[in-house]
Amino acid sequence: MQEIESQPRTWAQALDMAIAQRSALAVPGERVLAIGCGTSAFMARSYAALREQAGLGETDWAYAPEAPIGRRYDRVVAISRSGTTTEVLESLSSLPPRTRRVAVTAVSGKPIDDLTDDRVLLDFADETSVVQTRFPTTFLALVRAALGLPVDHLVRDAEAALPAPLPVDIRDYNHFAYLGTGWTTGLAHEAALKIREAALKIREAALKIREAAQAWSESYLGLDYRHGPVAVPGRRSLVWIFGPEPAGLAASVGKSGATMHVGALDPLAELVVAQRLAVALAAERGLDPDHPRLLTRSVVLSGMAVLPPTFAHVFANHSTVAPTAPSPGASL
């Protein structure tokens, strides 16, 4: 909880450095690709939507292993808290040499530094927890300020999010659906991931081991929720909307018996509340939300070659354009 509670401070620090980071994140007219894995991929999605919203130019996003390196980009922004994620390093090493590379990390002196031209270092937002909370939100606070979007209210809303009541009594709910629109879709996916990371448990019975999901979460585009997923929720479901409510959705959700929550705070601050809910859910079940099973701080894979950027263009010229990154809403 200490890292969650520190977010007003880390956001304020990010806002203070925004002007200095515009040359890395907010150059007008460039064609930009943002990449990452897991939480960082969701933040890449939000960054891409925000940059286009600010009118600074075409911005794509992709999961690092699926990065369309055969396409022409002026700049690639790679997000990796640890700076050691293998798939991110491999994608960076495969880019044509003319592409400017930016690393967004919480740690300096890592392999990603050798593969990039510019570094956005958020070391004050680094975390001891395996599960990310303040690093991704601090990055998006920085992005919004660097892009020239309104941010005067952000720290105030983050402060309000910490003591705010949770939207429901978690003991009465076991299904959580998070919806977003535009840049907040990345937040919805991240909120759902926090439930899955923090509140799953292994049960062992006699000679047999099985996995039991004590709570489940999903995330979707807000306007797409009625195209199938709305049939799933019931009276123990919470449907949480980040940003404005899609017209008529309340009536559709109401028919299912589910509870719908539309936050009054900035969507980024609502994510702080969602983080708190995930921690509370884990605590209710006697779990450790900081160390979910099978997860580590960084995914480092053996057998994947990371080439120095000077040789990467030889292979990039023969690359195949990857498909558009899929929505993670129905995955996992």
Question: Where are each of the predicted segments found?
Answer:
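Glycine-rich phosphate-binding loops that contact phosphosugars or nucleotide phosphates
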Residues: 27-156, 162-163, 236-268, 331
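Structured C-terminal subdomain patch of bacterial secreted/periplasmic proteins
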Residues: 263-291
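Anionic-ligand anchoring segments at beta-strand to alpha-helix junctions in alpha/beta enzyme folds, i.e.
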Residues: 13, 17, 25-75, 171-234, ...
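Structural signal for hydrophobic packing residues in well-ordered secondary-structure cores
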Residues: 5-15, 19, 51, 55, ...
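An N-terminal, well-structured beta->alpha segment
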Residues: 1-30, 157
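Internal, active-site/partner-interface "lid" segment
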Residues: 107-108, 114, 141, 145-172, ...
